[in-house]
Amino acid sequence: DLHLLSRRQRQMCIRDSGTSDIAVISLGGTVVSASIKIAGDDFDEAIVRYMRKKHNLLIGERTAEDLKIKIGSCYKRAEVDYMDVRGRNLVTGLPKTVKVSSEETEEALRETTAQIVETIHSVLEKTPPELAADIADRGIVLTGGGSLLRGLEDLISAKTGINTMTAENPACVVAEGTGRYAEVMEELGK
């Protein structure tokens, strides 16, 4: 549970509606933030491009999303999952099935997730020292549907050295938080 008016800070990586917004929140306001035009659809598009380049296989965004949800990962995992992916062979024009591994999805998503990590680094570099120390102690919280991508917590933790966790019910937490914030601000205004 994030407390919007708390003196203890958190960094949030909010991922929805076509952008990834990375922000340091303190005392009910944004201290430092940055946005990049990357969201869940960009993960799907990266998988479509990878399948075309690596396997000469044309797949749709729905198939890419299914692959992402079922076995997709952006960080090495102990176990490797596989999925048969159907599409159109770009050489012959005929239907083709390819067995794809979760390791391949990591490769497909590498460039996109690297941009998110770079933006987090940028926000941390601009964060006042006291707030940065608090973030290092308390961690980074991921919200939004994109935060459900397997391995994202581990990737961000590995690249920043900061514990990273996904909020409970991440797809709804932004809307719920906005509602709570409005209630608190209304009470303070009275």
Go through each PLM region and give its residues.
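Phosphate-binding glycine-rich/basic clefts of nucleotide- and phosphate-handling proteins
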Residues: 27-114
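Single conserved hydrophobic/aromatic residue that forms the stacking wall/gate
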Residues: 1-13
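Phosphate/ATP-binding catalytic cores across multiple sugar-kinase/actin-like superfamilies
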Residues: 108-135, 181-185
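Acidic, glycine/GT-rich loop-and beta-edge segments that sit at the periphery of enzyme/chaperone cores
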Residues: 60, 180, 184-190
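Short beta-strand scaffold segments in enzyme catalytic cores
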Residues: 20-25
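Conserved phosphate-binding/catalytic loops in two-lobed NTP-binding clefts
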Residues: 154-179, 188
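Glycine-rich phosphate-binding loops at beta-strand->alpha-helix junctions
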Residues: 132-156
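Residue-level signature of catalytic and energy-coupling elements of molecular machines
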Residues: 14, 47, 67, 120, ...
